[in-house]
């Protein structure tokens, strides 16, 4: 139509019915469901593929690790079997250096021994860590001697103990390894040669706390351990164990608990001598700085001499109880040579008493100045079969080796002081000589107080008179005081015993004098025969009479000098 505008043609869809809407919604739902299932299947396929990938990766890692481990084991075996020890150590050091460069930890190794001597830090750590054992530790060592009151708890090997000091964590591990000796078989172990245990502690901490560990923590631990050991210390007496002589020398000393009841309060000896000994001991243990200032080794020597039964062993036990020192009983005949003696003595601990009983009988100590030719046994080349010499013993008592230890007491005992070499007796070796005499009235009163619990009795005066007139030992008097529970009967029996003992003394004295006269007579006869033989030899030495007579005069002069020297020496011994 003219003048009319053309409008765009718009297609209008028919309005869907409700049935058509339902079908469309159903189709749409099925489509979404298919899409959801497709997505799930795709994700499931992806997860399965990822798991397989991870499993393959794990297998690859394990295979690689096994290959590396096998290669490392093979390399280690080749290094140990075919490379010299020097190269082996060099390679090990290189690997440790590489791994240590990237580590923030520092390790301190504390071995049980420093050369021949005990390592004080190791002993302190062993005592200190016993108080740091926690429930996380699975293995510990516990021991107890029959007469000890406390259990000894120590860390078992390869156990880790953690300690915290001023907020810093320190990790301790005990390492042990056994070294077998082929020189000696231990009769207590039928399956192996003698085993010697080498022990060490490993201390780990962050390397930035190095100064704290060395300058503060370790000194604190040593001081704390020393106090702990003194508080719970049980006295011990050590003796040599021959079957352990060829391992560590500390293992050669075996100990038992020392439960000796002797004290200075109960000790029956002269009261003045007892007081003097106690004061000397107390002064010795308090003078550490003094010995250091004057340049002397911190040690003290005592010589106990006197007849058997006068209380030498009881005095040693009283000294140990007074100072709380362990005792090392050294049997010199069990030691093969000077080197072995030196190592055994160095293995003894500080704050201890070393005793050599009956030193005049325990070993033939040859005088260093003697011109006596060596015996056949002295020419044996193997040093293990050469005996201890006087020189070797003296070198440890006051030589350079005497400074290898602190707060030590050395005690020699003998029944016959005059038999000892003078070199053993001088100050610096045996500083104090203590004469353990026969029983005196004061000794008897001490015994009566200990055994009978009495201070006075009407029979004391008679007993004291008998004791002054008789050579009787405190041990013999003590035996009489134990004969009866009745005080009167005991003291009356002691009076009768002293009478019998006095008669025995007189008989022994007469017998001794008779023996001395016979010995002098034999000596004179032997001297006369020697002189006659020497004169005969002198007379045939020359054809000229004047030369013979001159030689004879010189011989007689020399013999007179020898006789004078022998006489002076005999008088000196008698006077002593």
Curated annotation (Swiss-Prot):
Family: Belongs to the AAA ATPase family. BCS1 subfamily.
UniProt key word Membrane: yes
CDD domains reported for this sequence: RecA-like_BCS1
Keyword terms, alphabetized: ATP-binding, Hydrolase, Hypersensitive response, Magnesium, Membrane, Nucleotide-binding, Plant defense, Transmembrane, Transmembrane helix
GO biological process per UniProt: cell death; plant-type hypersensitive response; response to bacterium; response to molecule of bacterial origin; response to UV; salicylic acid mediated signaling pathway
Catalytic function, reaction form: ATP + H2O = ADP + phosphate + H(+)
Originating species: Arabidopsis thaliana
GO MF assignments: ATP binding; ATP hydrolysis activity; identical protein binding
Protein name listed in UniProt: Protein HYPER-SENSITIVITY-RELATED 4
GO cellular component: mitochondrial envelope; mitochondrial outer membrane; mitochondrion
Compartmental location: Membrane
Assembly mode: Binds to the Yariv phenylglycoside (beta-D-Glc)(3).
Cofactor: Mg(2+)
EC number: 3.6.1.-
Enzyme kind, highest EC tier: hydrolase
Membrane topology: Single-pass membrane protein
Expression triggers: Accumulates in response to flg22, thus being a FLARE (flagellin rapidly elicited gene). Up-regulated by the Yariv phenylglycoside (beta-D-Glc)(3). Expressed during hypersensitive response (HR) mediated by the bacterial pathogen Xanthomonas campestris pv. campestris. Slightly induced by the virulent pathogen Erwinia carotovora subsp. carotovora. Triggered by benzothiadiazole S-methylester (BTH). Accumulates in the presence of 2,4,6-trinitrotoluene (TNT).
Disordered: annotated segments: 508-532
Binding-site residues, ATP: 306-313
Transmembrane residue ranges: 55-75
């Amino acid at each position: 139509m003219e003048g009319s505008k053309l409008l765009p043609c718009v297609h209008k869809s028919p309005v869907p019915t409700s049935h058509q809407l339902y079908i469309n919604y159903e189709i749409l739902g099925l489509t979404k469901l298919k899409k959801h299932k497709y997505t799930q299947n795709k994700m499931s396929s992806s997860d399965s593929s990822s798991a397989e990938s991870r499993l393959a990766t794990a297998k690859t890692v394990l295979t690689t690790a096994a290959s590396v481990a096998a290669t490392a084991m093979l390399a280690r075996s080749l290094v140990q079997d075919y490379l010299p020890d020097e190269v082996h150590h060099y390679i090990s050091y290189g690997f440790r250096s590489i791994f240590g460069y990237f580590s923030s930890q520092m390790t301190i190794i504390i071995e049980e021994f420093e050369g021949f001597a005990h390592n004080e830090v190791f002993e302190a750590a062993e005592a200190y860590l016993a108080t740091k054992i926690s429930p996380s530790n699975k293995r510990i060592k516990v021991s107890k001697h029959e007469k000890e009151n406390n259990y000894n708890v120590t860390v078992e090997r390869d156990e880790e103990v953690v300690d915290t000091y001023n907020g810093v964590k320190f990790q301790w591990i005990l390492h042990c390894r056994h070294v077998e000796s082929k020189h000696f078989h231990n009769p207590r172990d039928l399956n192996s040669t003698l085993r010697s245990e080498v022990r060490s502690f490993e201390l780990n901490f962050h390397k930035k706390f190095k100064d704290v560990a060395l300058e503060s923590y370790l000194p604190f631990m040593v001081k704390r351990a020393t106090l702990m050991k003194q508080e719970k210390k049980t006295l011990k007496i050590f003796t040599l164990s021959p079957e352990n002589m060829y391992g560590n020398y500390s293992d050669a000393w075996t100990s038992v608990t020392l439960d000796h009841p002797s004290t200075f309060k109960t000790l029956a000896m002269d009261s003045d001598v007892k007081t003097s000994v106690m004061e000397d001991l107390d002064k010795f243990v308090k003078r550490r700085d003094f010995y250091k200032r004057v340049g002397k080794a911190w040690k003290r020597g005592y010589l106990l001499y006197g007849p058997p039964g006068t209380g030498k062993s009881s005095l040693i036990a009283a000294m140990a109880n007074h100072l709380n020192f362990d005792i090392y009983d050294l049997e010199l005949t069990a030691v093969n040579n000077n080197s072995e003696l030196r190592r055994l003595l160095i293995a003894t601990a500080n704050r201890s008493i070393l005793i050599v009983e009956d030193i005049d009988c325990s070993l033939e100590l040859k005088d260093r100045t003697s011109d006596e030719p060596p015996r056949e046994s002295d020419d044996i080349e193997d040093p293990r079969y050469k005996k201890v010499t006087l020189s070797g013993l003296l070198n440890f008592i006051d030589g350079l080796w005497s400074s290898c230890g602190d707060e030590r007491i050395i005690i020699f005992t003998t029944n016959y002081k005059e038999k000892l070499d003078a070199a053993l007796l001088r100050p610096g070796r045996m500083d104090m000589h203590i004469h353990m005499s026969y029983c005196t009235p004061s000794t008897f009163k001490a015994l009566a107080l200990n055994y009978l619990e009495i201070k006075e009795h009407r029979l004391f005066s008679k007993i004291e008179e008998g004791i002054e007139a008789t050579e009787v030992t405190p041990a013999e008097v003590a035996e009489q005081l134990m004969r009866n529970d009745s005080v009167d009967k005991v003291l009356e029996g002691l009076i009768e015993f002293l009478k019998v003992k006095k008669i025995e003394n007189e008989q022994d004295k007469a017998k001794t004098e008779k023996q001395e006269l016979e010995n002098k007579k034999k000596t004179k006869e032997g001297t006369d025969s020697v002189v006659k033989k020497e004169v005969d030899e002198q007379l045939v030495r020359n054809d000229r009479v004047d030369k013979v007579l001159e030689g004879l005069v010189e011989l007689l002069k020399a013999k007179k000098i020898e006789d004078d020297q022998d006489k002076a020496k005999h008088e000196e011994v008698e006077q002593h």
